[in-house]
Amino acid sequence: MTPVVHCSVGNISLFHIGSFRPSHEIQIRRFRSTERYSRVPSRRLLQPQRAFNLISIYKRSSWSSARRPRTLSAATVGTDVTVEDPNPPPSGETSEESSEDTAPDTAEASEQAEASTSSIPKAGRNIRKSEMPPLNDEDLVPGASFTGKVRSIKPFGVFVDIGAFTEGLVHISRVSDGFVKDISSLFTVGQEVSVRLVEANKETGRISLTMRTGGDYVKPKTETPKAASGGRNTTATTSRGSPRQTRERDEAKSMGETNYVQGQFLDGVVKNSTRAGSFVTLPDGSEGFLPREEEAVALFTLIGHSALEVGQQVRVKVLNVVRGQVTLTMKEGEDDEEDLASLNTQLKQGWSRGTNAFELAFRRNKEISAFLDQREKIIVPDVQEAAVASVGTELDAEVGIEQSPGKEPETGNAESVAIDSSITEVKETDSIAAVEKDSEISKTESVETASSVVISEDDSTVDGKLVEPTASVSATETEIKEDSSEGSVTTEPTEAASTEFVTAVVEESAPTASSVETSEDDSTVDDKLVEPTASVSATEAESKEDSSEGSVASTESVTAVVEESAPVSSVAIEVPAPEASEASAQEIIEDSTTVEGAADDQTVESDSPPPEGVELSSNGAPDSSIAEDKPDEPEESLIVEEVPVTASSESEDKEPAAVPEEVAASSEKTADVAVAGAEASTATATISPALVKQLREATGAGMMDCKKALAESGGDIEKAQEFLRKKGLAAADKRAGRATAEGRIGSYIHDSRIGVLIEVNCETDFVSRGDIFKELVDDLAMQVAACPQVQYISLDDVPEEVMKKETELEMQREDLLSKPEQIRSKIVEGRVKKRLGEYALLEQPFIKNDKVTISEWVKQTIATIGENMKVNRFVRYNLGEGLEKRSQDFAAEVAAQTAAKAPPAAPPKDDKPEETAETEEKKPAVAISAALVKQLRDETGAGMMDCKKALAETGGDIQQAQEFLRKKGLSSADKKSSRLTAEGLIGAYIHDNRIGCMIEINSETDFVARNEKFKELVNDLAMQVVACPQVEYVSIEDIPESVVIKEKEIEMQREDLQSKPENIREKIVEGRISKRLGVLALLEQPFIKDDSKTVKDLVKETIATLGENIKVRRFTRYTLGEN
């Protein structure tokens, strides 16, 4: 219940703040009548029941503070404020009656309240006091600059007083052009700043300011008229949603609105392109989506690239409109096929399907290529009708000939040519399709159509093919008549050619095709077999002469038998791409007679008693064969390559026996050319770009030089390298700079006496950098160091001869004799595996956990990381292994040295005092200070007495003293080089975990091996090996004699030596060999830290400094991923 406090001037009601909604805004609610009123009966003693709100409500977020009271005071001045009864009357009549009764009194009270409120100032917010000059509303123009003072600093910005109706806010994003982290560090209260106006809204009482240099102010909004009653704007009350909700509603309204209809053509500009399609800007500024599959050029869709570019003008059609989103297309339906055809024509320009150099050369000529492409266009239906008509005419003629067997042909000695080219392709329709080409085209091109019959212009002979409707047997009757060529002897026009017998047997129902072409001027037969899916049995054609009757059979039926029960159908027409060979291209230019194509079997026979023929083998060479006299027996052969063979025709008046010999001779000549071209094309085809790249990386030679070298060497990399070296184009055995495998190279050195270098591979570089993989490599290296018997990685790496030897030894053991024969092999296998397992690393128990083997531990690591890992290789060094240490007897050595020095010291007794006297007289001449000796000792590392003596000899000159000590040290080093070195150090250097080296350097005693100078030498030489990938040997003496001989032979064959005199060639070769071999030797390399001296000089200087012999014994270098 709300309490009411009565006072002399009015009533004060107290409201609890919990009844109000918290807000950060300041709202002023003016007078608002809540209900209608009427006259009030005079019997009422209290003030009229008038409910009105003349309440100034101030709600701020700071009211939630605990310091302020939790009540809200609402007061009215100059009038009485009453609160409606919390228990209103239940009946509506009473309320109406009371309202009517109180109406006149309420009106009077309201008049008095208005008079009082007009005379007394309103209670509200205090007027802000500004220290800046006042500004008019007309001055508040966006972009205008003002000077103000900072009034307060907030985390989100600063409030600045510019003298306007309120303080302006400079947001933290507008304080500076850059990023502002702490705004309090930039401003202080009272600081004068220069700002620019962004926006001033007097309705909301807000001013936005900026201190940025850019123009980020906005245009002022147009004021909307207020409500006549003095309340809030009607538009503000109607839209109570947030700006985001309002924007979503506006977008939803405009989503379904569009000005386009389906099927409308538009011109647009490509805005951008994605994998799914392209976005096109339409004329009204909206965007439409063009899917990739709806582009006009569909070919690029197949390979995943679009033909459209950003900014390109396109002509599109509206495919559909869904919820305001327009989907476009560039396809017009009927024009798609034409677009694809034109695209294929453009793409085929400059492209050839030829397999040899001659065809490629012709195809590069635009005129010849256009002519050849034009000839491919063949009208199939007209040719089919002509071929069917000609077949019917030929069949009638054949029937007439068979009815008159007594009539003999005019030419008794007729030749028979059997050609294996009549193979039919079985389809589902019962029709015959044949393709006719004119004779002019048949001169210059090989057979392009499969399953076609080409008829000459004189129509003297017709190739007919008959397919019976029973669809089980197809009968084909073919007659070939040869016209005399220009270079041959012509015959009488009335002379008739003998009839040839052709029997074609197709053993399978697979689609096949053949063509027989007879030209006008040539007697050539172009035969081409196309077999895409199944094997085709050979056909055999024979000519049989009946000498006993004295006549030659004019015609016999020619049948083609299909052994399968599949329905026999039409002969389909295929137009494959022309494949011209080297020989055929040359024949085209010369207009000579050609026979092209490769059938399964082709036999040319004569009517002589032993019939001979020419048969094409797989490489195109002619083989003579004797045909059998059984015309009905088919002969099997294989499908061979299409190797063109040319053969000149023979005139009809020549002797039949001479025909096969001349044909065979011509075929052999042409076959040699074809074989040579085939070998050249095969050699060229085997040289792949990958092979050229490999040779180029290995030698550093040019690309064309590498290609030529591979062609000369038949694709052999080693021979190609020798060829390049003979030409002086590359340095042999150059290694590739990069390897492909990932992984890590690790090392483990135990007490500088046992060393291990190991390479472990993984799949990715990310895993190789992980801690788990690093730990694996280090543990495996330690495992190898702890197992001296380990020689192999796994049992699979054990050589076969070792396995056989162990198996033989186990089979000879006596305890196996009592075992059954069946289980002996298993017992032996188990023993051999256990025996050889001691030499395999993966079979060893892990040194950190002997319950698992190395193999199991690697598998666990693979399961943890999720990548495959493999131990590729390792090497293990034991210091001094293979060297014999001599027993040192110091007493004997001293006695031997004394005995060796005594005899030479005895003779010069008389001269010695004079020399010593002279030296004693010379010594005081040069004053050698201790500081000079110390300086020389620090620079050279020599002994104190040696430095003093060197300075005395050189007169105190430091540089000459250093040269003196160096010469003396080198001479002493040469003398000490013959001493045995069995001690020393094993060192390793790993560069970026991808290149590693392990090296062993020996010294005479372990005392020198522990010296810091010696350790530094070992580390420097290990780094030297890593920096020189071409180094393979320690010194030139370690290079095998076979390598030296081979290098000498290569150098002697170099072309630049041929012009040199004989007497100096040998010296030039020796110099080149020494230089070449010096690249392979470590001691001949320039030192990486000082290239003025070689590694050999560095070792000698160390020998002179330490006083013992030092020898580089061996080293091993690993590169990650190399074979």
Swiss-Prot record:
Pfam families: EF_TS, S1. Residues 94-103, 630-639 have a biased composition (Acidic residues). Its main location: plastid. The keyword Repeat applies. PROSITE patterns: EF_TS_1 (PS01126), EF_TS_2 (PS01127), S1 (PS50126). Keywords: Chloroplast, Elongation factor, Plastid, Protein biosynthesis, Repeat, Transit peptide. This is Polyprotein of EF-Ts, chloroplastic. Residues 1-73 form a transit peptide. Residues 143-212, 263-331 form the S1 motif domain. One of its GO terms (molecular function) is translation elongation factor activity. Residues 231-244, 486-501 have a biased composition (Polar residues). It is found in: Plastid, Chloroplast. One of its GO terms (cellular component) is mitochondrion. GO terms for biological process: mitochondrial translational elongation. It comes from the Eukaryota. Disulfide bonds: none annotated. The gene is PETs. Residues 245-254, 908-923 have a biased composition (Basic and acidic residues). It comes from Oryza sativa subsp. japonica (Rice). The keyword Nuclease does not apply. CDD domains: UBA_EF-Ts (cd14275).
